[in-house]
UniProtKB/Swiss-Prot annotation:
Pfam families on file: HLH
Matches recorded under InterPro entries: bHLH_dom, HLH_DNA-bd_sf, IND-like
Gene this chain is encoded by: LF
Assembly description: Interacts with PIL13 and PIL15.
Record-given protein name: Transcription factor LATE FLOWERING
Amino acid sequence: MYMDAFGWSAPAAPCQPSCGPGGDDDDDVLLAAVLGASFELHSLVDGGGNGAAGAVRSDDAYGLDVDLPSHQMSLLRCQDGLSALHGDASPTAAAAAFLDSVDVLPVPAIAGATHDDGGLLDRFAFPNVAETTTVQAAASNTAFSGYSSNTTGGGNISSGESNTYTEVASTPCAVSTTTTTTALPPSKRKLPEKYPVVGTSPTTKTTTTSETAAERRSTKRGAGGSSSITFGGGCHGAGAAAALLGYGRGYEPDTEAIAQVKEMIYRAAAMRPVTLGGPASASDPSSRPPPPPQRPRRKNVRISSDPQTVAARLRRERVSERLRVLQRLVPGGSKMDTATMLDEAASYLKFLKSQLEALETLGNGNGNGNLLHHGYYTGSRNATATAATGSSNSTVLAFGRDGLAGFVKSNRNLQL
């Protein structure tokens, strides 16, 4: 038999309903139906008090040789095959017929049954619910009966089929609902410690790919945006050279040495010939300065003929031309940007003015050979001293009469 093949031959515990409020007179009969390997009535207790006249033979309805009182006639019918049994049918045959189906039939209408007595079986008669509600059976017969009523032949029960049949049968005295909690499948995402965006708490917000990329870009900007390269704490010239030589941030440049170097550079620049495009340059083409580089004309560009636009363009061209001339006059101006070149031009101009004052003093015959009586250039913009002050706290670089003779007597054009 199917029960022995699956190892479910052990009988289930009988379900004994509790007694109602009717007392001992109403609870004369104790009905116990065992669902499993056997289907039999364990005991029937005759309350006595209604007499044999009120008893009806139950073998007409169930095939069991038992006398029931007349006020206990509302019985549940758990199997449609029991109605076809005869009076000599055994409980084993009834159990075999029960195993073929688990459908619930309505309560049979038995003649002489009364529902006003408040008997034990009246509260278990459900004339309307019996057609829609399945009766839950023992756990051992649930899976087999559900499987045998929906499949043909033997075979293994798969996990999908076993999870499908949630409606099971049981005795009418203890109708309960079994809730099965199915655990969630394991997540296929990466580990949270490697990818902190994926959290395990229910309040974790799933971020999109664009948000993650934006966070990464902002992190990179915050890490690399504060880096800067400084040479000598922002000093020009000597500070940058000191940083390149490895003196560090605490290096303090020697201002006197810097002034001396500038004096030497300005002296060499003042003694070189300067050509500004005079009439002599027309006869000597070699002394002509190289023409400015021609910019390629842009295609599909319309040049405006508006007077204001033309005037602004001409003004920009004149400024550019003057900057190019000044770049040739300032020592090292061709290797500087416009702002640095203008700064050096101011320093060079002060040096030239100091030299002019010294030459004018020597030309008037007032000089007695003492170089301290003449103004000199110290390398700084506002560090011009005179002999009256008698200050000698900076480097003095002056020229004597013999030293300046060749420069003064030359026919070079010193007009600026």
